[in-house]
Every structure is written in structure tokens, then in C-alpha cells.
């Protein structure tokens, strides 16, 4: 089963807001701040329409928390861990929905695109969902496009063969639940 769930949008928008305030973070530095703030446990719904438009993400997270009586993040690290934990919980909810609809138990989550490079999020996802997380290519869209063209041109016989070739073309990481 395939379902796209909001990914790093919220965190990227926070970074953009912080940049305008003179606080620039490279992702490894921000993930370290998040890791250091792991005791902060407030969760938000990353798929809430409030978070869809660009701009002012930290303020919108504050509003979301205030409206629901939740403890709002105070530090940039708390914002980051709040978002990452919330994403992992959103993935867990989505897995339950997919399992209910399909009648199948999902045993592995495949993370593609930019999120595949976020080891903290991937480990949180494995821990919170209680299943293995396997990363795929950062440029998943590109690989998919190449696969379709290769099948159309007769270079590969079918999708199974294309997937096997793609899997040999990148290094995957596997995250086990704690």
C-alpha cells in the first residue's frame, strides 16, 4: 500500500522563519538540538490544514497548542522534536488506517525522498510504529521516471526488474524498533 504523508514541510518552514530572525541551522545541527530536547513530548497533527500554507510556522504551532491546551515548544530544538515525534505518530495512524482498509499488517515502512536522510526521524518512526523502517533513494521521483522510461523503451522487462535495478543503485539504511 502506498500513501503520502506530510513530511519535512513543517520543519523546513520553521527553518525558513528562523532564518529571517538570524538563526540559521543546517539540518544536522537542528537534529542535534531535537535530539537534545527529546524530553519535550507535545504532539501536533502535521496534517492539520493550519500547517498547509507557507510562512509563520512557529507561530502556527504556538496557536495550535494554545487552542488545544497543549504545552507549546519554547526552543528551536523543542519545535524540531515536536514536529519529528508528531510525524512519526502521524505515520503510525496512517499505518493503522491502511491496515484497516486492506486487512493486511504492514511490516516495513519505506521512507523515500529527503526524509530518507533523517536518521532521527527514521528511528523515531521505527520506535513509535513498532516496525522496521527502510530508507529508499533521496531522488525517488527521478528513479521512478527512469523506471517508466526504461520499461517503455524495452530496456527492462517489467516493474519488478526495474525495482531490482533501482535497489542495487543506492544504499539503504534499516532502522529497527527499540
Residue ranges and their predicted role:
Residues 1-108, 117-141, 147-177:
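Active-site core segments that coordinate phosphate-bearing ligands/cofactors
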Amino acid at each position: 500500500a502506498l500513501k503520502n504523508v506530510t513530511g519535512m514541510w513543517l520543519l523546513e518552514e520553521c527553518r525558513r522563519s528562523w532564518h529571517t530572525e538570524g538563526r540559521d541551522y543546517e539540518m544536522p545541527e537542528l537534529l542535534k538540538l531535537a535530539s537534545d530536547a527529546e524530553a519535550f513530548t507535545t504532539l501536533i497533527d502535521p496534517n492539520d490544514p493550519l500547517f498547509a500554507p507557507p510562512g509563520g510556522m512557529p507561530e502556527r504551532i504556538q496557536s495550535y497548542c494554545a487552542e488545544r491546551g497543549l504545552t507549546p515548544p519554547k526552543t528551536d530544538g523543542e519545535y524540531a522534536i515536536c514536529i519529528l515525534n508528531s510525524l512519526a505518530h502521524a505515520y503510525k495512524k496512517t499505518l493503522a488506517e491502511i491496515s484497516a482498509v486492506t486487512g493486511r499488517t504492514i511490516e516495513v515502512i519505506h521512507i523515500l525522498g529527503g526524509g530518507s536522510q533523517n536518521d532521527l526521524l527514521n528511528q523515531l518512526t521505527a520506535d513509535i510504529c513498532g516496525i522496521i523502517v527502510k530508507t529508499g533513494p533521496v531522488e525517488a521521483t527521478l528513479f521512478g521516471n527512469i523506471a517508466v522510461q526504461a520499461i517503455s523503451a524495452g530496456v527492462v522487462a517489467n516493474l519488478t526488474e526495474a525495482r531490482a535495478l533501482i535497489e542495487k543503485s543506492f544504499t539503504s539504511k534499516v532502522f529497527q524498533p527499540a
